């Protein structure tokens, strides 16, 4: 569900967030319209709006864990976790975490990948939100959900800054809610 459809329609913060995201055509390869959130991070007001909207949504939901998907979920997750009094768990690509880890494989358009987390990072029945910068197919979020749920955690919702208008990945989330702040910008200009 898009934030504008959930009580924030017309909220100027959403426009500021959208305007702060740079679109880079043909990156990392031809035909891709890359949504560059590094420019959002350079705009301290838009970045604060992003965190504030997520915090407002989750502060009264008894969330005990914010899980961030590597790498850009790491940019938003810790700030949200601190503000709502939750711990932050990084969900990493293979070989990035020392010590004992558990993993979940998922399919990409061309190939496979895995997410890993430390054994014991999440406890059974802990309430979790998963944060990433963008959702397209939903494969990464689905793998993150499976990884956390395999340890007995309750995934309450997945949250992303950017989501495709026809969020194709929603069906991969097993009925879990998906909360998205803005649609990709600049697609009409380059298509």
From Swiss-Prot:
Transmembrane residues, as ranges?
none
UniProt keywords, alphabetically: Cytoplasm, Glycosyltransferase, Purine salvage, Transferase
**Entry GO terms, CC:** cytoplasm
- Quote the InterPro entries the UniProt record gives: Ade_phspho_trans, Adenine_PRTase, PRibTrfase_dom, PRTase-like
Following inactivation of the gene, the phenotype reported is: No visible phenotype under normal growth conditions.
Q: Which residues form a coiled coil?
A: none
Metabolic or biological pathway, per its Swiss-Prot or TrEMBL entry: Purine metabolism; AMP biosynthesis via salvage pathway; AMP from adenine: step 1/1
Reactions catalysed, as given in the entry: AMP + diphosphate = 5-phospho-alpha-D-ribose 1-diphosphate + adenine
Q: Does the keyword Cytoplasm apply?
A: yes
Single Gene Ontology BP term? adenine salvage
CDD domains per record: PRTases_typeI
Q: Which Pfam families match?
A: Pribosyltran
Q: Which domain of life is it from?
A: Eukaryota
The UniProt similarity line reads:
Belongs to the purine/pyrimidine phosphoribosyltransferase family.
Q: What does this protein do?
A: Catalyzes a salvage reaction resulting in the formation of AMP, that is energically less costly than de novo synthesis. May contribute to the recycling of adenine into adenylate nucleotides and the inactivation of cytokinins by phosphoribosylation. Possesses low activity toward adenine, but can efficiently convert cytokinins from free bases (active form) to the corresponding nucleotides (inactive form).
Q: What is this protein called?
A: Adenine phosphoribosyltransferase 5
Whichever gene encodes this chain, its name is APT5
């Amino acid at each position: 569900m898009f934030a504008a459809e959930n009580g924030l329609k017309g909220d100027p913060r959403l426009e500021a967030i959208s305007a702060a995201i740079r679109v880079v055509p043909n990156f990392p390869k031809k035909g891709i319209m890359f949504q560059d959130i590094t420019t959002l991070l350079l705009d301290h007001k838009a970045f604060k709006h992003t965190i504030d909207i997520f915090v407002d949504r989750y502060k009264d939901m008894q969330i005990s864990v914010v899980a961030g998907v590597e790498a850009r979920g790491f940019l938003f997750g810790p700030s949200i976790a601190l503000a709502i009094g939750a711990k932050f768990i990084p969900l990493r690509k293979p070989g990035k975490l020392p010590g004992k880890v558990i993993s979940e494989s998922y399919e990409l358009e061309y190939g496979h990948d895995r997410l890993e987390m430390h054994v014991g990072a999440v406890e059974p029945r802990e309430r979790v939100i998963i944060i990433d910068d963008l959702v397209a197919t939903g494969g990464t979020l689905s793998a993150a959900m499976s990884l956390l749920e395999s340890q007995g955690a309750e995934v309450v919702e997945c949250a992303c800054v950017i989501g495709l208008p026809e969020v194709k990945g929603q069906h991969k989330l097993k009925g879990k809610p998906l909360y998205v702040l803005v649609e990709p910008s600049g697609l009409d200009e380059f298509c």
